[in-house]
Structure formats: structure tokens, C-alpha cells
Amino acid sequence: MTEFVVLIPARLDSSRLPGKALADIHGKPMVVRVAEQAAKSKAARVVVATDHPDIQTACQAHGIEVVMTSNRHESGTTRLAEASVALKLPPHLIVVNVQGDEPLIAPELIDRTAEVLVENNVQMATAAHELHDFDELMNPNAVKVVLDKNRNAIYFSRAPIPYPRDAIRAGKREMPSETAVLRHIGIYAYRAGFLQRYAEMSVSPLETIESLEQLRVLWHGYPIAVETAKEAPAAGVDTQEDLDRVRAVFQTV
């Protein structure tokens, strides 16, 4: 398999769960749990990229490699662009971006996302899974993605896409039957050189409107290959309820 590294963007501020990166999960901070889970993949290296000294200290205390970045980043991708320079990663090296609030992420998904980047010879790859719940289709916190026939992303949105117009007109809570509805999984693969290119791209209006950093890539004309996972991954941690659920999982391990 082609060599890749995992970079984990981590910040302390969180509107819905303040300080969640350092939230205790069965004796270890969440960001450490994420890094340890990522280390189970085939990654040659796992590094946390942060702007907060408390996260740096926590990672170092648990033997996790960490790099400090600016506190001015508005997205994890631009943070990783800075980190890749600080780490002197070669432009061709594949970087997998694993979110810092995914302590249950499957190592196999990390590996597969890196493989999809290589197989499709694109600048960026990500993943999605089929969605079968109408409430999730309508939920703006569940990001949806629609694909073209080559399995590249056409668009990502918090809105319900594709929109089941006829069903909704008829007052029915039915999912579209003509095609699968896909929920985006927040994992990305790209080469270190493309991270630098991303950071130099102008911010797109769609990215700002939807608050979705990947839309910058589509706006500037680059394809994003999408792997459809066979099953939904474990949910990340956005709320106290999510954190309680994850803690319960680790207590049984």
C-alpha cells in the first residue's frame, strides 16, 4: 500500500461542547484516544496539529507526536497545510485528515480513504455512507453528498439532497427511491502538496454559506473521489450525549 501519514487537527474551542478535545474518555483525553485509534491504521506516522498548549501537553504526556500551529485557522484543512510545512512533509506524501472528535473511527476507513485517492488519481478523496432515515435527510447537522457516475462529488450540502419533491408534496416522509442518499463522513485524503494549494485558494462563497470546507475544492474545479462505506461509522463527539455514549463504549472494552 502507498505510504501515508495521519494528521489530526485539534482545537480546544467548541461551541456545543467546550474543551471537548481534552474531555476524559476512560482515563485519557479524547484527542489522545483519536490518535491511538488512528495508529491502528497502516499510517506510517500519526501527528496531532493544534494551537493550544494544553492539547500539546496532553499529547506529549501520552507519547503522541504533536505540532503547534497558528490560532487563526478557520478550518482543519488550512491548519494541516501549516502543519505539513512545519513537519517538512514531501509534496507527494499522502495525508489523511482524521477529525479530532472521532475516537471510534475505524482504522480500515482511514486506510481505504488513502487507497481511494491513489486509485482515482485525484487531488482529494473522502467517504460517505448510505442514509435511510428521513429525519437525518432533513437534519442540517448531517451533511449530504451527491455523486456523478464516476463516484466523484457533485456537491455537499446541509440541505436535503437529493430533495424528494414528489414525496414531500404528498406529505410523505419517504426517502428518494431512484438513488441512494449519502451522508458525508468527515475524513479526507490528499497529498501534502495539494494542502498548500488549498491554503492558497480563495475562500468560495458556497464554503462560507454552508460552512463546509470541502466546497472550496469543488468551487475551484478539482474533483473529489468519494468512497461509499459498507456501513455507517461510529458517530463523532459533538454533544455531551455523544461523549457519554463514547465513554460507555470504552468502559466495555
UniProtKB/Swiss-Prot annotation:
| Gene Ontology terms for molecular function | 3-deoxy-manno-octulosonate cytidylyltransferase activity
Q: Which domain of life is it from?
A: Bacteria
The catalytic activity, as recorded, is:
3-deoxy-alpha-D-manno-oct-2-ulosonate + CTP = CMP-3-deoxy-beta-D-manno-octulosonate + diphosphate
Checking InterPro entries in the record gives: Cytidylyl_trans, KdsB, Nucleotide-diphossugar_trans
Query: EC?
Result: 2.7.7.38
Query: What is this enzyme's class at the first EC digit?
Result: transferase
GO biological process annotation, one example: CMP-keto-3-deoxy-D-manno-octulosonic acid biosynthetic process
Annotated pathway: Nucleotide-sugar biosynthesis; CMP-3-deoxy-D-manno-octulosonate biosynthesis; CMP-3-deoxy-D-manno-octulosonate from 3-deoxy-D-manno-octulosonate and CTP: step 1/1; Bacterial outer membrane biogenesis; lipopolysaccharide biosynthesis
Cell compartment(s), UniProt: Cytoplasm
Which keywords does the record carry?
Cytoplasm, Lipopolysaccharide biosynthesis, Nucleotidyltransferase, Transferase
Q: Which PANTHER family match?
A: 3-DEOXY-MANNO-OCTULOSONATE CYTIDYLYLTRANSFERASE (PTHR42866), 3-DEOXY-MANNO-OCTULOSONATE CYTIDYLYLTRANSFERASE, MITOCHONDRIAL (PTHR42866:SF2)
- Family in the record: Belongs to the KdsB family.
Protein name listed in UniProt: 3-deoxy-manno-octulosonate cytidylyltransferase
Organism the protein comes from = Neisseria meningitidis serogroup B (strain ATCC BAA-335 / MC58)
Gene name linked to the record: kdsB
